[in-house]
Amino acid sequence: MGWNHIIVGAGSAGCVMAKRLSEAGRKVLLLEAGGRDNYHWVHIPVGYLYCIGNPRTDWLYKTAEEPGLNGRALLYPRGKVLGGCSSINGMLYLRGQAADYDGWRQMGLTGWGWDDVLPMFKRSEDYVEGTSEMHGAGGEWRVENQRLRWDVLDDWMKAAEAWGLPATRDFNTGDNEGVGYFRVNQRNGWRMNTAKAFVRTTQGDTLSVETQAQVKRLVIEQGRVVGVVYDQRGTEKEARCSGELVLSAGAIGSPQILQLSGVGPGALLQKHGIAVQHEQPEVGANLQDHLQLRCAWRLKDALTLNTLSATLWGKAKIGLEYALRRTGPMSMAPSQMGAFSRSSERVETADLEYHVQPLTLEAFGQPLHDFPGLTASVCNLRPESRGVVEITSPDYREAPRIAPNYLSTEGDRAVAVAAIRQSREIMAQMPMAKYAPEEIKPGPAYQSDEEMAKAAGEVGTTIFHPTCTVRMGADEAAPLDAQLRFRGLGGLRVVDASVMPKITSGNTNSPTIMIAEKAAEMMLAG
């Protein structure tokens, strides 16, 4: 078959692009390096615990040792499966703030303001409460309420209100400041990923999906991308398309593939013996991510997941509840309660996000503590720190160097200190007093600004939102223009979280789906 388009990466963006282009009559080849999403833990909400760190579903990346994290290297999960990160993420439906997108437009990116992107969010949305000025219904991307509540989280919400945050039922109206329960991408207690939502619902026969197909490089002829060379189960194959190729391999994979293809910083490519096809210094630069500071407390006389799952009977009860009703802890998103607040009065819109969980543990992947506990992870939504993604070898199988450069600016360290102080102030409010909270992370020993900045380096970890590594911009230095076309190369658009010029003020999965909706519209309009 002669392909009109090849899409590299069947993740959050690629699956959307595949459906929109193929249903418009284009012949589309969708390539995914991972396997099919038939692993049962992909679809059970709590299954992220078994997908992250699993080579069946995760690229198993690690960061470089980070000076801002006191020399620690972090695990850096990315989805390697149909659906990409939407198959292993926290399922939270969050758009960010109107100010994020209006800021993009003010940077010269015409068509990317809040009023421009809101219809794109609504297009794919299937909102549990139906259509409204802010929400869509009948789309592929299901948004539901969570299927359980916790008294301890209700009390944390009251504490946040006592501290000064307004209660909210909807973080997605353009101004997300407030506290409330997150809404999630689930349907009837099952995870909704983009493979299920978009690829499986595609009508017609113009879409072909190939899994276990890892792209080695783009094929570039006379300044135009015309196809890809990929490995599929040990066999090298080549595919070509007559129209544009869409690179949707994510904020790590897209710059890596470009660099392997000879598109990127010239010195880096030459260092690894790769012929420079098109020098573009910013490919892989500008990495932005949200760093979460895991603040945690031991509680007295509280029902939390720690205590609920402490016995075999408790675990059996949890499993039975999910099997019979699709409710209970197995239907949980990793974080149930959320809040958006400002780190200081000088900040115009919320720059902190809380992910609040009725559980504590020493580190991700380790057992829950044997006492009642609550975690309130707080992250800086608009970091100043900028990192880099760079190939380490001409071999496509070698992981790139990922250096987020967390807490590398005075401003980011100051926000981290303010975030820890604020989390303590909320826990000190009267609604939480009955639990006699005892801080275990970072711990009461850290009190001065200098001590808390050090503590941020000890408890900080990624919240899995890498972006901006192949940014769009009105300036000629940006790899992409506002149409997501690659400057200086024909036949190529990049469509994923890497294209953001600045990270959004919230979780990044739904903005990535919006970007794909807009990209498909632009491509189909010619």
Segments from the language model and where they lie:
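FAD-dependent oxidoreductase catalytic-site/capping-region signature
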Residues: 2-3, 118, 124-173, 179-182, ...
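Short, hydrophobic/aliphatic alpha-helical segments
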Residues: 60-77, 238, 450-457, 494, ...
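N-terminal glycine-rich phosphate/pyrophosphate-binding loop and immediately adjacent elements
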Residues: 1-122, 279-280, 290-299
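Conserved redox-cofactor binding core of oxidoreductases
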Residues: 105-225, 231, 294-316
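Glycine-rich loop(s) and the adjacent beta-strand/alpha-helix scaffold that form part
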Residues: 23, 27, 35-37, 218, ...
